Amino acid sequence: MNPFEGIVMGIVQGLTEFLPVSSSAHLVLVPWLFGFETPGLVFDVALHLGTLVAVLVYFWRDWLRLVQAGSRGVGTADGRLFWFLVVATIPGVVVGYFLEDIVETTLRAPLLIGVLLIMMGGVLYLADRYGGQVKRLLDIRFGDAMAIGLSQALAIIPGVSRSGITMATARLRGVERAAAARFSFLLSTPIIFGAGLMQMLKMDPGLLNLSFVLGVFTSAVVGFLAIWFLISWVSRHSFNIFVIYRVLLGLTVIVIALLRG
């Protein structure tokens, strides 16, 4: 992968990690559509480390407050939220650890991704349309956190979207849009860190070239901007724009996949 392709993939990762459109799907589809060298799961996760930097920089005050409160137990709303995030991370860690090889070898077919983009777009639409607007971030309870955490485990499949499925689940549990987005982003921090660390330990040092560095840096900068955009957007609008994008992209991918055979 040359430096230009590394930058493009960094932009793709930064834009799509936090928007409910599936970053893993885009990291498979962009090389497939434009003839780039396929980066593989290791480079995918390395780009996720760039977006990890983005979410840590954006939410550092939140994490500082939550960690401090969590270290003192569950006597405060922030303390409870911290431990809810910890527990909600576990399903994604377990599923990712045991199913990584299956996903890498069998669940990255463009046709399947196209179908899942459309299906999960429908789920996001229905959840946002019929979900309540009752709970704020600190109103989230243990059952809400576990439901969101279990749904996050499905995001290992390209086309599902980690942010999409977690925000949809939160909306179904009555969490308002802005709070659903913030919880989703906070929940992404440990899962991205863990997945990235696991893959980095296996990674060939020869992959640490200019393209790799440019991709990670670009994904960090663009990811930060994507977080800012989504939080601003959902404060005033629904998720419909992302639903429309998912359906159109999914249909396009299905048509191209069928034409290519």
UniProtKB/Swiss-Prot annotation:
Keyword list, A-Z: Antibiotic resistance, Cell membrane, Cell shape, Cell wall biogenesis/degradation, Hydrolase, Membrane, Peptidoglycan synthesis, Transmembrane, Transmembrane helix
Catalytic activity, as annotated: di-trans,octa-cis-undecaprenyl diphosphate + H2O = di-trans,octa-cis-undecaprenyl phosphate + phosphate + H(+)
GO molecular function, a single term: undecaprenyl-diphosphatase activity
InterPro entries, per database record: UppP
Enzyme Commission designation: 3.6.1.27
Principal location listed in the UniProt entry: membrane
Any GO BP: cell wall organization
One Pfam family linked to the record: BacA
Origin: domain of life: Bacteria
Topology in the lipid bilayer: Multi-pass membrane protein
Keyword Hydrolase: yes
Annotated transmembrane regions: 16-36, 40-60, 82-102, 107-127, 140-160, 183-203, 211-231, 239-259
GO cellular component term, pick one: plasma membrane
Compartment list: Cell membrane
Role of this protein: Catalyzes the dephosphorylation of undecaprenyl diphosphate (UPP). Confers resistance to bacitracin.
Family: Belongs to the UppP family.
Note in the entry: Bacitracin is thought to be involved in the inhibition of peptidoglycan synthesis by sequestering undecaprenyl diphosphate, thereby reducing the pool of lipid carrier available.
Name of the protein: Undecaprenyl-diphosphatase
